[in-house]
Amino acid sequence: MVIDRAEGTSSSDASGNPSAVSFSIPKSYFRLLEELDGQGFKDALRGETAYLLERTSYEHLKPYLAMIRRHPRNGTPRVQDAHFLMSFDREFQAIAFKYVGIFESQMRAQYAHRMTCSHGGLCLYDRGLFLREGNHARSLEHYSGEVERKARKGDPSVKRALAENGGRGPIELGIECMSLGTLSMLYSNTADRDVTDGVAESFGCTKSELASWLRTVGDARNAFAHFDSYLVRRQIPSTPLAIKGIGASNRKPFYIALLLMHLLSCDEMIEDWTLKYALLMNSEISGLLERNEGLFGYLYGEMGIPEENGRLDMIEAAGGRLVFAVAKGDAGESR
């Protein structure tokens, strides 16, 4: 079967002139193309649609197709728009994933430093430092497995540390081996309030807020790591505690961006812009939204993205605690 692009004009071709390029479509794709055509996608039988399906599975496209079918641009659903939406989602995830990494790095540094200073390098093996025995046992099992896996892969520093400590991994090394999920479990279960409050204060929040936000960031991170569909979900993977002073819905997928900007904001007056992570993220996300406003601005509300005139939420989340306080009319007090 040959589908000729000359059968129609691409919506991106402003001249209206058809292309002479033809695509040979494998028979195994006929059923999918016919199914999409039956669902009302105007460009379903075009060669570009089969080309896309050879590079992105139908299952992966489904959430984007469903969103475009429910809310077609210009009144007509197109596979091309689903592809554009998927690309927009991937770009958002790539930006968010980068800042998840920065948040993770600070979380690891803060927790390991405070636990080591207060309780020594082998503190994670001390049952008395944790609130719930069962949770500690599960966390320690995960931690030990992750450290041993790193040693088996040939990391000499981890191998040496295990040998010197009877098979136990000091937290200053082990913290870099553990998953964010394991770190989240350990932090939430840590009994020493000086440690947990100190870590939370470094992010400008309370222990209960940080424990909640850690779960949400971890769940979102797992989606980003595999480029699963994200912004087109009906709600965020796990609903976090709301950020005080931020009016956006904490159930919508986009809330993860506000959460990360809030966590990475800072009270301190820093001259080095490369360290102003929240403002950098705000700039990147704002740029992405502005570039795609013409295509998908009408869907932003579905995703929980503030309207252009309501983006103060993003500025407040990203601007740092001092900036937020100034915006509230009290320059001498941070939140």
Give the positions of each predicted feature.
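Extended intrinsically disordered or low-complexity regions, especially N/C-terminal cytosolic tails and loops
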Residues: 1-219, 231-335
